[in-house]
Curated annotation (Swiss-Prot):
Keyword set includes Repressor: no
Keywords (A to Z) from UniProt: ATP-binding, Kinase, mRNA processing, Nucleotide-binding, Nucleus, Transferase, tRNA processing
Molecular functions per Gene Ontology: ATP binding; ATP-dependent polydeoxyribonucleotide 5'-hydroxyl-kinase activity; ATP-dependent polyribonucleotide 5'-hydroxyl-kinase activity; polynucleotide 5'-hydroxyl-kinase activity
Protein name as catalogued: Polyribonucleotide 5'-hydroxyl-kinase Clp1
Catalyzed chemical reaction(s): a 5'-end dephospho-2'-deoxyribonucleoside-DNA + ATP = a 5'-end 5'-phospho-2'-deoxyribonucleoside-DNA + ADP + H(+); a 5'-end dephospho-ribonucleoside-RNA + ATP = a 5'-end 5'-phospho-ribonucleoside-RNA + ADP + H(+)
Organism: Gallus gallus
Amino acid sequence: MADDGGDEKKQVAKFELERETELRFEVEASQTVQMELLTGMAEVFGTELTRNKKFTFDAGAKVAVFTWHGCTVQLSGRTEVAYVSKDTPMLLYLNTHTALEQMRRQAEREDERGPRVMVVGPTDVGKSTVCRLLLNYAVRLGRRPTFVELDVGQGSVSIPGTMGALYIERPADVEEGFSLQAPLVYHFGSTTPGTNIKLYNKITSRLADVFNQRCEVNRRASVSGCVINTCGWVKGSGYQALVHAASAFEVDVVVVLDQERLYNELKRDLPHFVRTVLLPKSGGVVERSKDFRRECRDDRIREYFYGFRGCFYPHAFDVKFSDVKIYKVGAPTIPDSCLPLGMSQEDNQLKLVPVTPGRDMVHHLLSVSMADSPDDNISETSVAGFIVVTGVDLERQVFTVLSPAPRPLPKNFLLIMDIRFMDLK
C-alpha cells in the first residue's frame, strides 16, 4: 500500500498483530520511518505506546512493537525489513519482572533492600533491551530502580568510554530512551574494559559504594533495587570482571542471555544465594558489525553535544594550556625489571600520567573531573561532563574545544580519552 507523497511515494504498510506477537522492523540507511498505533494496545521495549501518535525512527533503528492483547500498527517510510513474529521470549521476560516485583514487595514488608539484578551475556544478545524492559516495567508500577551501566562500549547513561548510574523516575521515551538528567558518570577512557581492567573493576566498586550510600538514605531506591548492564566480554578477565561486579553490588539475581556455558560457570562461581536464570535472546536481536558499532558510538557522542536530532547548539571556545591540568589514567606497560622495587604492573594501571597539550590531542574527548585537587583520587571521582578538542595552537598556547556549556570550564582537571570524535555531519 502507498499514499501519494509527491514524486517519491512514501511507503505505507499496515500490520494487524494478534495477541502476544511483535512487529519487528529496521529503518533503511539515510531514511526515517514513522510508526503509529491505530487500534489496540502495544509497547516498545516496555514503554506503552500512545494511540494515534506518530513516532519517528532514524536510519539504522531496530524496533520491536509488542502487544499483549492485539493491535494495528502503521509504518510510513522505507524499512530494510518489517515482519510480525509469534516467536518471542516476552512472556519469560515478564515472568522475570514479576519475580523481581515479588522480591520488592517482600523487601517492603520486611524492611530489607530490593533485588539487585545483573544482566549478562555475549555481544548482540539484547542485554540493553532486557535492562530497558525490566526498568520500564518496574517504573510503571511506581518503583524507582537504578540503572547501572558497566558497558563502556556503549555508555548509554552518558557517552562511550564511561561507566555510570541513573535513577529511573519515568519510563523510557519511545524515540529517545531514558531521560539522562543528573546521571552519575565516571571516566574510563576507552571502549573496551581490557585496556585497563584494574581501573574498570575499581570504578565498578566505586559505583557500588555510591549506590549503597544512596540506598541508606533513600528507602524507595533501596526497595526498588538496581538493574546492571554489562559488557559482552565474557571470557578470561572479562568473566572475572562480571564476578567482581556481582560481588561489589551484592547481586541477588543474574540473568544470563543465550549462553549455557556462561550460565553454568556463574552458577559454579557465585554464592549459592544468588539466583541465576538462563533466558533466551529474542529472535529480533541483530548482529552489529564493527562499522555499525562505531557509527552508533559517534551518534551517541554527537547527541551529547548537539542534543537529540540536533536540538542543542554547543559552544566553541579557547582554553589556555596554563588554565588546566590534563591527565591520562594508567601508564604504558614497561618490563617488570624496570619497575621500582615492590611495585607491580597493576599499580601502574591506576597511575595518573600528566599529558602535555599538543597537536595529537585534536579530536580526542576530555572528561572534566569534579576533583578539586590531584589528591582527590581523580580516577575515582565522578565527572561533570565532556569536551572535545577541535584545534591546538602551540604558538598561543591554547586549544579550542566544543562544549555543551559555555565557558569557563567548571573545573580544571581533565582526563583524556582514547576515543576520538570527528564532527563531520
